Amino acid sequence: ELVRELVERAVTEKTGGVEIRTLARDDFFLHLCAHLYKEATTYPWIRMKRDMTLYKYIDLYMLLYETTTSAADEIAARAHALGLGTECYFAVSEAVNLFGDESGAGTRILRGLPDVDTNGLFSVISPEEKKEYRYTERDTVRRFFCADREKLLEEVGVWKP
């Protein structure tokens, strides 16, 4: 259902003299957020050291840098409408913590998502083990530069899908 809606809202963009179909800007942004969130909060990705890939944070940062106030409001509203508030909040706050927020768009998006449980942003799930973990280190920069992020996790309970 969600994928169908995203595809139906797709737009045609011109780049390098070529027209391509792509997701609407706010949907594209949220798609990036959802992927980053999934990888950063799923234990196997942490084990493979693919949970905090720099290029994904840079992509978000560059999009935030170019985002207007009205577009930031649209992203927050769309995230809320699609049930992607947590994913969006996580990805935006992490990108802002790593690179800053010169345009103010990141802060604007975060303010537009007041219902997100920020304590839950540090949870990690292990679907195969049916366990839930939580980061003991909440500082994004420290986590990013930690050579073994598995050591920053503590088991907190059973994960139920």
Q: What is the role of each PLM region?
A:
Residues 1-161:
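Conserved NTP-donor binding/palm subdomain of two-metal-ion nucleotidyltransferases/polymerases, i.e.
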